[in-house]
């Protein structure tokens, strides 16, 4: 790391205006104000207040938030108390003993798999890696003629970043190697694990592609005839969304429900899962309250009534992306990013005129307080909130990591706003882009780049210039994550957005270009998601970035598919199923 880094001066956050100061926005008024920075500097700006032009402005038709500030601040949980932490420590020790017991090899693998699904494997990561390495990677303790055990081992080894070849499945293929053996169709448990394992495939792994097709075909048939209720439930969940595409904590509650119904359930594991869930929920509530206080203090939702007030949903996203318990700072930071991306997106998609949007883009490109002078009042508060936030995050990174992230973070936000402007021009021109033209811009406009850029600098222990530059140029893992995020979002929100007058999304672009039906277009987008996941899987195995940042990048894609899995807008339109999942994770304790 360069010794010159510490000499670089980062512009510190300007003091945010008090909410009452912006109550004059709707009135004809002009005033000057002086803004104090953290370091004692003074930035002088003049705000021109005038009657807002309403003609031609769109409306998002978004519902009010279900979770107001006062309600959020009232949430509290007894599970943040020390006594629960001590009880959990005792249970963790007991489960650790279960892992170390000399039991059947398959039982140990099944326990590891259960711990992951229950959301408690983080307590045993070191032990799990040691077990997988000594028992299942360097030594072959599994009968490779057993499809169930082979597929389960393959899945877990890849999930824990071990390099394992798809060739382990060759013995299950027919003599010609063109498909899997027909004799496997009655092995429902084996087919389910084969199906799950196939989603960890990289580009060019044809055996795993065959495995996916074979397992999918026969699992759909088994659903109609199998009598095992617990197994049927697992199959239905997997066919809906495979484990590799699921986020951990938002799914933990439903898996606890499924686990406690199983005849082979371990009571200690179950009790730990329930206790741990409630303890994590208590932590999440404290983080949400802090993020909500920030959101309320910005005044954005009060002064810009056309934007989505979704701070709880913004926080919910972070629970699937940044999973480690110790990264509360990063979850709160990511919540703020989500809220700012949502606000600016609504400015561009709903309220701003093209002239105003061009002015806003220029101001972001220049990145200084003076640029605010050219903006209409409603944009000034938005600009200043973003300016303050980014500079504060850069300041914290320089303080904590010794690295000046300012130019990298600025570029992420500039690229986002420039992509928004391109889409705004398409809208005003009535332009219908091809799918290729749309994707070239929309993988940026989805907002994943600021998220991953900020997280890179917070989650990388030792930041190397080479990795920062690779991030700056948007490494393939960033592109893959953002592409899945975009496509999943389009599958859920495109109809609502087009009805509001937005530009065509990927589904509509394909329909226009190929004269295809909506279902044909959606099937094509699903295939693009699958192809991009294979790229993502390859990068997860080979990337030079830290393993945790790679995992977080994949989690961003996973969270998008979780939110939009029913192909409806679970964010902007407050879908009832998403609200149920949100309550289940953040507010309703597990009894």
Swiss-Prot record:
GO biological-process terms attached to the record: diterpenoid biosynthetic process
Enzyme Commission numbers on file: 4.2.3.108
Transit peptide: 1-56
Molecular-function GO term, any one: terpene synthase activity
Residues annotated to bind Mg(2+) 3: 489, 493, 497
Cofactor detail note: Binds 3 Mg(2+) ions per subunit.
Family the entry assigns: Belongs to the terpene synthase family.
Protein name: 1,8-cineole synthase, chloroplastic
């Amino acid at each position: 790391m360069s010794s010159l880094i510490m000499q670089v001066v980062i512009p510190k956050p300007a003091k945010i205006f008090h909410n009452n100061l912006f109550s004059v926005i709707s009135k004809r008024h002009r005033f000057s104000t002086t803004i104090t920075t953290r370091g004692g500097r003074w930035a002088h700006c003049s705000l021109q207040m005038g009657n807002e032009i309403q003609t031609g402005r769109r409306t998002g038709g978004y519902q009010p938030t279900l979770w107001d500030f006062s309600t959020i601040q009232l949430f509290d949980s007894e599970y943040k108390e020390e006594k629960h932490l001590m009880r959990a420590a005792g249970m963790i020790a007991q489960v650790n003993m279960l892992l170390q017991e000399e039991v059947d090899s398959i039982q140990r693998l099944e326990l590891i798999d259960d711990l992951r699904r229950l959301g408690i494997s983080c307590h045993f990561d070191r032990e799990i890696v040691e077990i997988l390495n000594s028992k299942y990677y360097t030594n072959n303790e599994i009968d490779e003629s057993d499809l169930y055990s082979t597929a389960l081992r393959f899945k877990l080894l890849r999930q824990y970043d071990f390099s394992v070849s798809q060739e382990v499945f060759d013995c299950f293929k027919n003599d010609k190697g063109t498909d899997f053996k027909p004799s496997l169709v009655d092995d429902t448990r084996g087919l389910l694990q084969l199906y799950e394992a196939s989603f960890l495939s990289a580009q060019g792994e044809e055996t795993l592609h065959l495995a996916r097709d074979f397992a999918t075909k026969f699992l759909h048939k088994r659903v109609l005839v199998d009598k095992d209720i617990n197994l049927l439930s697992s199959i239905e969940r997997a066919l809906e969304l495979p484990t590799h595409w699921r986020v951990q904590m938002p799914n933990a509650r439903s898996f606890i429900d499924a686990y406690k119904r199983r005849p082979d359930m371990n009571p200690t594991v179950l009790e730990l899962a329930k206790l741990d869930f409630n303890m994590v929920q208590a932590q999440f509530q404290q983080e949400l309250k802090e993020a909500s206080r920030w959101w309320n203090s910005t005044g954005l939702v009060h002064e810009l009534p056309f934007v989505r007030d979704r701070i709880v949903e913004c926080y919910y996203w972070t629970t699937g992306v940044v999973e480690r318990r110790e990264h509360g700072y990063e979850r709160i930071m990511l919540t703020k990013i989500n809220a700012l991306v949502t606000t600016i997106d609504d400015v561009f998609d709903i309220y701003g005129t093209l002239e105003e949007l061009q002015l806003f883009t220029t101001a972001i490109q220049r990145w200084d307080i003076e640029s605010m002078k050219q903006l209409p009042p409603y944009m000034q508060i938005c600009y200043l909130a973003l300016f303050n936030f980014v500079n504060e995050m850069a300041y914290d990174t320089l303080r904590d990591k010794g690295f000046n992230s300012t130019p990298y973070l600025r570029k992420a936000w500039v690229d986002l706003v420039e992509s928004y402007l391109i889409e705004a021009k398409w809208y005003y021109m009535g332009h219908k882009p091809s799918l290729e033209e749309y994707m070239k811009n929309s993988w940026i406009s989805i907002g994943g780049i600021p998220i991953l850029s900020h997280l890179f600098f917070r989650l990388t222990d030792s930041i190397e210039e080479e990795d920062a530059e690779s991030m700056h140029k948007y490494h393939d893992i960033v592109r893959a994550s953002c592409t899945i995020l975009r496509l999943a979002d389009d599958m859920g929100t495109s109809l609502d957005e087009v009805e509001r007058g937005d530009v065509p999304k990927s589904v509509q672009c394909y329909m226009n270009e190929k004269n295809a039906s909506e279902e044909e277009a959606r099937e094509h987008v699903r295939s693009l998601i699958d192809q991009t996941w294979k790229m993502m899987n390859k990068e997860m195995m080979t990337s030079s970035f830290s393993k945790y940042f790679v995992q977080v990048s994949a989690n961003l894609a996973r969270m998008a598919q979780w939110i939009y899995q029913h192909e409806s807008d679970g964010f902007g339109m407050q879908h009832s199923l998403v609200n149920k999942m949100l309550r289940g994770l953040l507010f309703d304790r597990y009894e």
